[in-house]
Structures are given as C-alpha cells and as structure tokens.
C-alpha cells in the first residue's frame, strides 16, 4: 500500500458544516485551505492526478442541517451549493495557493478533473501550479444528464497539462479518451480513468490530490473523512 497523506484535524471528521462558524456575524462560507488539507508530501512526482473540490458559489438559501437544533432560529441566508453538503469546497483563489509545483518533477504530467463551467478556471489553476495546458485527456459520459443553462449536461472532462518534457518511458499508447460509465455517488469518478493513467505510466511516481480512494501504486493526499478501503 502506498503512502496516504491525510488531515488529522484532532481526530475529528471534517464535514461541510464544520467549515461554518456559528458565531460569524455575516454568515459567509469559509474555506480555510490550510485548516482542511494537510501539507503536501516532501517528494517529487512525474504524474499528478487531481479532482479539485470546485466552488460553484451556489444560490442563496437558508442554512439547513441534519442536526435539527444547530441553527435553530437562524434566519439569515448564506451561499450553498449541492457540493457543499457532500464535501468542503474550495475557492479558486485558495486552490491556486496550493504549492503543487513543489511536488512536481521537472518532467511531469498533470491530469485534472473539470466540468464545462469550470473549464477556464481549470486552465488558470493548472498554469498557477506551474503547468501548460495541452489537451482533453478523458471525456466521461455519465449516461445520465443534469439540467444545464444551455444544453443538458452529461459529461465531465480530464484535462492534461505538461511541465517540462513528457515523462519517459511511458507505457500503453492505446488508452481511449472516451469513458462511458454510469454515474454513481456524487462526485465519485470512474476508476477507468485512473486505471488508464496507470497503464500509461506504470513505472512513474504518481499521486492523487483530493483523493477519494486508495489505489495501488499511487500516493494519496486526502481528507480523513474521504478515505475508503483499498479497492
């Protein structure tokens, strides 16, 4: 089993609601990156795979919780999105502060998950981390659609960024771009993508950022409450 780098937070699980301060007068959403994620490992990687917890801003609505009395009598509104109820989201300006460059080898590939609305932000983030955008590496057809402002949405994307030269040697050259897998739980990505990357770079040092699973041959940088058993 590879190394897992986790945020301890005094052995308490972190939920979306733990990131809200009940005493905060303005009741605005806070995303203290340094509080919810650990420091990056002191190691260099040739392959980095990231699924950033994008902040979509959400819409104005009342703060609600499964704990009935937590916000009893609270009438102010705050910004929430559906993702907020599943995991801590982080704003772009805070994601850009993450020193991914410090763990990237001179020759490194970054694979980053994104959605249509976050495409421009993803390229900006990759550049802030010290990479150059190259192409769309994977397209995930979720086989079901969500409502969209322009067309019904049913795809997500993995963008490929490069730093330096293409890591050598590489493995498989026949990994397909299109991944057609029915959508599962919220934000859980198909294993076929990381399996494909592993086939492409079987011998390279690899790390998954904002990880949800523990994959053989990969280091993981992850919140404690997102850790699941090795598949």
Feature map (PLM): residue ranges:
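Class I S-adenosyl-L-methionine-dependent methyltransferase catalytic core
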Residues: 2-231
């Amino acid at each position: 089993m590879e190394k897992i780098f986790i945020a301890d937070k005094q052995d308490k699980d972190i939920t979306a609601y733990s990131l809200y301060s009940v005493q905060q007068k303005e009741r605005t959403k806070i995303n203290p990156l340094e509080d919810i994620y650990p420091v990056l490992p002191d190691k260099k990687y040739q392959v980095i795979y990231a699924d950033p917890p994008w902040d979509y801003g959400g819409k104005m609505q009342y703060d609600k919780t499964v704990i009935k009395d937590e916000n009893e009598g609270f009438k102010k509104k705050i910004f929430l999105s559906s993702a907020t109820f599943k995991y801590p989201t982080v704003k772009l300006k805070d994601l850009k502060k993450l020193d991914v460059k410090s763990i990237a080898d001179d020759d490194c590939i970054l694979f980053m998950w994104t959605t249509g609305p976050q495409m421009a932000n993803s390229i900006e983030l990759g550049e802030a981390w010290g990479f150059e955008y190259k192409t769309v590496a994977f397209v995930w057809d979720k086989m079901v659609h969500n409502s969209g402002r322009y067309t019904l949405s049913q795809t997500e994307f993995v963008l490929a960024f490069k730093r330096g030269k293409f890591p050598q040697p590489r493995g498989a050259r026949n990994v397909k771009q299109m991944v057609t897998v029915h959508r599962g739980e919220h934000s859980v990505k198909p294993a076929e993508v990381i399996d494909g990357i592993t086939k492409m770079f079987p011998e390279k040092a690899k790390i998954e950022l904002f990880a949800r699973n523990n994959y053989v041959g990969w280091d993981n940088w992850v919140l404690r409450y997102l850790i699941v058993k090795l598949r």
